[in-house]
Amino acid sequence: MTDDVTNVEQPSTASEQQPQDVPAAEPSAAKKRRANKAKSKATAAAIEQRLGHSFADPSLLTTAFTHVSALKSARRTDSYQRLEFLGDHVLGLIVSDMLYRAFPDADEGELSKRLADLVRKETCADVARSLDLVEGIKLGTVGAGAGAKLRKSVLGDICEAVIGAIYLDGGYEAASDFVRRNWTERMRKPARSLRDPKTVLQEWAQARGLPTPVYREVERTGPHHDPQFRVAVILPGLEPAEGLGGSKRAAEKVAASAMLAREGVGTGGNDG
């Protein structure tokens, strides 16, 4: 008699089971990058709202906030420095136009003093703080370690770079709107509170161990009854700055104001 053998299917071992499709966990580095990207986008949107300008080219805004210390490469042109250069001159033009229209009775000496005070680094830094632009500054360990976020020079640079970025993105009118919104009240500062630019420049030079500034007449043009003087102010280690005026003294003041503005020194108080 043959024994009946019952074929019973044995359960498969774990090694024989087919793996189920389980979503792979996102790598922590990728999650961090995605979170940082979302945060940067939100920060940029908030800054645009405070600036009153929506960028068609967001890369301009990013560059305007990038300190050279944040760059991994040696390409300094990827930092805000080029935009700062442009913004400095755009700001000077717009503020000069504002002053010319607002003070029709002021001579070139007074206008120059006001201009130097309004475009100095400290004023730009004050605008940057009022708009909370420090939030978007991108710094490397070098800058952050030195507290660069809070340094007046960095904030002033950022403000000028933002003006340059707005100018490139939206043109002169967009840049002018931004400057007028943020400089009109500052422009109304009483002129008597502004110090003589030649005195300020001399004190600034002496504080840095430099000799007394030298003023040299470069040229004299125009008729005898209405001459125009071009004067250069010279300090060792610095590029000369020039000024025009109806008298040598007026031209010297303009030249001193030009050097002060370039070096980020104002005439409204004590600058370090």
UniProtKB/Swiss-Prot annotation:
SMART domains attached to this UniProt entry: DSRM, RIBOc
UniProt-annotated binding residues for Mg(2+): 84, 157, 160
A Pfam family reported for this protein in Swiss-Prot or TrEMBL: dsrm
Active site, renumbered: 88, 160
Protein transport in keyword set: no
Stated role: Digests double-stranded RNA. Involved in the processing of primary rRNA transcript to yield the immediate precursors to the large and small rRNAs (23S and 16S). Processes some mRNAs, and tRNAs when they are encoded in the rRNA operon. Processes pre-crRNA and tracrRNA of type II CRISPR loci if present in the organism.
Subunit record text: Homodimer.
Name recorded for this polypeptide: Ribonuclease 3
Organism, as annotated: Rhodopseudomonas palustris (strain ATCC BAA-98 / CGA009)
